[in-house]
UniProtKB/Swiss-Prot annotation:
It is found in: Nucleus; Chromosome, Centromere. The SPT4-SPT5 complex mediates both activation and inhibition of transcription elongation, and plays a role in pre-mRNA processing. This complex seems to be important for the stability of the RNA polymerase II elongation machinery on the chromatin template but not for the inherent ability of this machinery to translocate down the gene. It holds the Pfam family Spt4. Its main location: nucleus. PANTHER family: SUPPRESSOR OF TY 4, TRANSCRIPTION ELONGATION FACTOR SPT4. This is Transcription elongation factor SPT4. It comes from Candida albicans (strain SC5314 / ATCC MYA-2876).
Length: 112
């Protein structure tokens, strides 16, 4: 499920209009991916218009097994994709690793 203007962050899975990623960045990943005030290429590379399933995450989500299962229990309230099709570019993954951030693709290919 997706629409033309909605995109899902490939790192955290939050769903927002593309304009929101450009204007405000990602509420969870901005310090890592720097969407805000960046060129559209960063948003194009690190978000996907193709995603499946929706989960609404509220303010008090610590007890939610769904939030824990999707690994979004520490993220800000909003709509999240269950699955985000696509993967971050290798250069972005390398930058994340330099910051000691482990990237788990949200496309279903990661195994625990």
């Amino acid at each position: 499920m997706s629409s033309r203007s909605e995109r899902a962050c490939m790192l955290c899975g939050i769903i927002q209009p593309m304009k929101s990623f450009i204007d405000y960045g990602c509420p969870n990943c901005e310090s890592l991916l720097h969407y805000q005030y960046n060129d559209n290429k960063q948003v194009q590379d690190c978000t996907s218009p193709s995603f499946e399933g929706l989960v609404a995450l509220g303010e008090d989500n610590k007890g939610s097994w769904v939030a824990r299962w999707l690994r979004i229990d520490s993220f800000t309230a909003g709509l999240y994709a269950v699955k985000v099709n696509g993967k971050l570019p290798p250069s972005i993954i390398a930058e994340l690793e330099e910051q000691n951030v482990i990237y788990r693709p949200r496309d279903g290919s990661a195994e625990d």
